[in-house]
């Protein structure tokens, strides 16, 4: 009986500290629902070839894929897209994004001086 009381006390303490399993479940359900809506929009906008390319990009670089998805969805919502995005259009969007996010690398080559001492 004392173990049940301890469990109840621990649960009430965790809920008092902001740990609410029901709230976490609701948040997870909301995230999943938003992701499903997002995928539904992308299915309507992208051709099958473009969706396949984007899914391969997601495997390698999820953050880049997310940026492209956001860009495409925003363009569709603002009416900038008049037709479905095909593979060629997706490639051009990827190139534009790559140009914006190119990283500059600097390599320093130091000369070594040989002393004949």
UniProtKB/Swiss-Prot annotation:
Keyword Magnesium included in the entry's annotation: no
Cystine residue pairs: none
GO CC field: cytosol; nucleus
Annotated spans, Disordered: 1-40
Superkingdom, taxonomy of origin: Eukaryota
InterPro entries named in the record: PDCD5-like, PDCD5-like_sf
Residue spans of biased composition, Low complexity class: 8-22
Annotated GO MF terms: DNA binding
Keywords: DNA-binding
Bias kind Basic and acidic residues: ranges: 23-39
Family: Belongs to the PDCD5 family.
Record-given protein name: DNA-binding protein DDB_G0278111
Originating species: Dictyostelium discoideum
């Amino acid at each position: 009986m004392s173990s049940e009381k301890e469990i109840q006390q621990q649960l009430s303490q965790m809920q008092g500290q902001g740990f609410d399993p029901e709230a976490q479940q609701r948040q997870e359900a909301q995230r999943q629902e938003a992701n499903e809506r997002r995928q539904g929009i992308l299915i309507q906008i992208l051709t099958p070839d473009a969706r396949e390319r984007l899914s391969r990009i997601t495997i390698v670089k999820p953050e880049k894929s997310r940026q492209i998805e956001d860009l495409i969805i925003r363009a569709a919502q603002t009416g900038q897209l008049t037709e479905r995005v095909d593979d060629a259009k997706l490639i051009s969007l990827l190139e534009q994004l790559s140009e914006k996010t190119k990283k500059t690398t600097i390599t320093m080559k130091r000369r070594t001086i040989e002393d004949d001492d």
